[in-house]
Amino acid sequence: GYNSLHKKATDVFRLLRVQRRVFRERGRELNREEYQRLLESARSQGRERLALLMEAVCSTGIRVSEVRCLTVEAALRGRAEVSLKGKIRTVLLPAKLCRKLLKYAKTQKTASGEIFLTKSGKGLSRGQIWREMKDLCQAAGVERSKVFPHNLRHLFARAFYRASRDIVKLADVLGHSSIDTTRIYLMTTGEEHARQLERLGLVT
């Protein structure tokens, strides 16, 4: 009857389910060279705030919503306290980033509190950061589909993992409660995987 047919169809579907996606679409992955071009474009246009903000996100792995935690006090301490869903995690800030943050804050006459502010003294919104980054695409020669704040976090994750090979530590740094989430951040287009296969030299 209908029920047995439905069960067979479900079983077939279960057998045919495609393995979890392992590689990322080429049009979505931002690489280090493209990131550098975005920074250069921002600086050549005199957009120092945007260039520094991108460096801050990409060198720490913070979420764009956590940029408000980058305060003068955090830069002086070398770490920021980030609160999310009742949990607080400590984000270490590279010494070079701290120096740049403090120098920028000084030029903006910001003695304390948030460093990245609008001209009216308000914190930058996610939408504003997104739009400002998109504005760099043409000059930087980077596809628009690759340029959005969260992709800087993905670039940080891949760089951190290549250096440490410690996915548990990376999950802590990113503030992930599940390593499965962290695995998504480490997906690449597959080009690196292909190079590794070639280096194995197992085809004579």
Mark where each language-model region is.
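Flexible interdomain linker/hinge and immediately adjacent N-terminus
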Residues: Y2-R37, L84-G86, K119-K122
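C-terminal catalytic core of Y-nucleophile DNA break-rejoin enzymes
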Residues: K85-K103, G113-K134
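Conserved tyrosine-mediated DNA breakage-rejoining catalytic core shared by Y-recombinases
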Residues: E34, T60, S65-K103
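DNA/chromatin major-groove-contacting recognition/catalytic segments
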Residues: T188-T204
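C-terminal catalytic core of tyrosine-transesterase DNA break-rejoin enzymes
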Residues: E55, S59, R153-S177
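Basic, Lys/Arg- and aromatic-enriched nucleic-acid-binding interface segment
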Residues: L30-V64
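Short, leucine-enriched amphipathic alpha-helices that occur as contiguous helical runs
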Residues: Y35, R49-A51, R126, W130, ...
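Short, polar N-cap/turn motifs at the start of nucleic acid-interacting alpha helices
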Residues: A75-R77, K146, D166-L186, E191
